[in-house]
Regions:
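Metal-dependent nuclease catalytic regions and adjoining charged, substrate-binding loops involved
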Residues: 3-4, 86-91, 97, 129, ...
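Catalytic cores of nuclease domains that cleave nucleic-acid phosphodiester backbones
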Residues: 45-117, 125-127, 132, 143-154, ...
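Short amphipathic alpha-helical segments and their helix-coil junctions
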Residues: 1, 16-29, 114-118, 183-194
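Short amphipathic alpha-helical face segments that pack within enzyme cores
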Residues: 41, 132-140
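Nuclease catalytic cores
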Residues: 2, 6-55, 80-81
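A short beta-strand motif that forms part of the nucleic acid-binding face
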Residues: 121-124, 170
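Active-site metal-coordination segments of metallo-dependent hydrolases
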Residues: 32-38, 124-131
Length: 220
């Protein structure tokens, strides 16, 4: 049984060989680029501000208006909230040995039967926004918070000032989880057969750390 997260499954879908080298063999590392470092710092600034009113660093001050709106929502606010699910979609700890999926919600605000699930994005455009990340986070939220029956989820693009919204109800849990079954089964099969074929993609030429792959721009 392959364990997965939204990011690891996305990596596998992009290129099984890249996934294998980074997540299985672990003989190479993906160095953090400027955009990734910036995103991590922005997430930390948002977490500290919502959790404990820590002053936001000047370069992230543009986040404050959006975070103030979120802070005014009624309910308990959980920042960088870790959740896990077993293969039977039962809630478990993020670090439990029997976890099947795990993920971190940037912000969950829950009150009575309703929860907000927010993921911050620091990319310059929301053009290719993928709400599937919200789908699996919402499944986990329903499972970890049994009193929640309604979820208002959103990808908050703080740079482009866009909010990609979607709503879910509890009886959608199974159908939302099914959206990932095909790709997870492919991942299981790759582990079973130890076959990790490369898939040429936009990262090959300049951004892939698997430099000994024939599709890599630095391959000799």
């Amino acid at each position: 049984m392959a364990k997965w997260s939204y990011s690891s499954l996305s990596l596998f879908k992009q290129c099984p060989r890249k996934y294998h080298r980074l997540r299985v063999v672990k003989d190479i590392r993906q160095e953090d680029n400027t955009a990734l470092i910036y995103g991590k710092e922005a997430h930390k600034a948002a977490e500290d501000y919502v959790r404990q009113d820590t002053v936001i660093p000047e370069k992230f001050r543009y986040l404050e208006p959006y975070l103030n709106i979120l802070k005014k929502l009624e309910g308990e606010k959980l920042c960088e909230h870790e959740m896990g699910l077993t293969k039977d979609l039962e809630p478990c700890g993020f670090k439990d040995k029997n976890y099947w999926w795990r993920g971190i919600a940037d912000l969950i605000v829950h009150h009575n039967d309703t929860a907000y699930v927010i993921d911050y994005k620091t990319g310059k455009s929301s053009r290719y926004a993928d709400v599937k990340q919200l789908q699996i986070l919402s499944v986990a939220t329903f499972k970890h918070f049994p009193k929640v029956n309604y979820i208002k989820a959103g990808l908050l693009f703080v740079v482009s000032k866009d909010l990609i919204k979607t709503n879910y109800v509890r009886n959608q849990v199974d159908s939302l989880a099914d959206n990932f079954r095909f790709d997870v089964e492919r991942l299981d099969k790759a582990y079973e057969t130890d076959v990790w074929n490369p898939v040429p993609n936009f990262t090959c030429r300049k951004y892939c750390p698997v430099t000994d792959c024939e599709h890599n721009g630095g391959y000799v």
